[in-house]
Regions:
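Hydrophobic protein-protein interaction segments
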Residues: 1-139
Length: 140
């Protein structure tokens, strides 16, 4: 997406989350947050101020939106997942690079939901501690 479209989509998502109509539970590999803070891997060359501002924004959202927004950080050296989104009991989507695979069959959705639950159980940083962890990375 272009920047204006991405910003608009993010604003819409924040407004939806703030409305209290839905909860968001997100599992992210911890190395993504650490790489962003350190300016390595995908984030190499991105200005430190920009990276820190983004991480601070994420930490603020975690504080303000908890428990409607729960982010868990897992160790991708121990557990692996392609990006997956569960939209309730009837739809799950897996991102495979250039496209998404959508599943509507109940047993497949249950299987992907169980996989996501496993990521949450294996998290090395619980949702209650994510904002503190993020801030510790940008205060080094």
């Amino acid at each position: 997406r272009r920047l204006p479209q991405a910003f608009s989509a993010m604003q819409d998502q924040l407004q939806w989350l703030s409305s209290g109509v839905s909860d968001y539970e997100i599992a992210v590999p911890i190395h993504e947050i650490e790489s962003c803070a350190a300016g390595t891997a995908y984030y190499k060359g991105v200005d430190e101020g920009v990276r820190y501002e983004q991480l601070d924004f994420i930490a603020d959202q975690c504080d303000q939106m908890f428990p409607r927004l729960r982010i868990f950080l897992f160790d991708a050296h121990r557990v692996f997942s392609s990006p997956v989104t569960i939209f309730g009991p009837n739809l799950a989507v897996v991102y495979v690079g250039q496209c998404y695979l959508a599943f509507r069959e109940v047993e497949r959705v249950k299987s992907l939901s169980s996989h996501f639950d496993w990521l949450v159980r294996e998290a090395v940083v619980d949702a209650r501690n994510v904002s503190t962890h993020i801030r510790s990375l940008i205060e080094r």
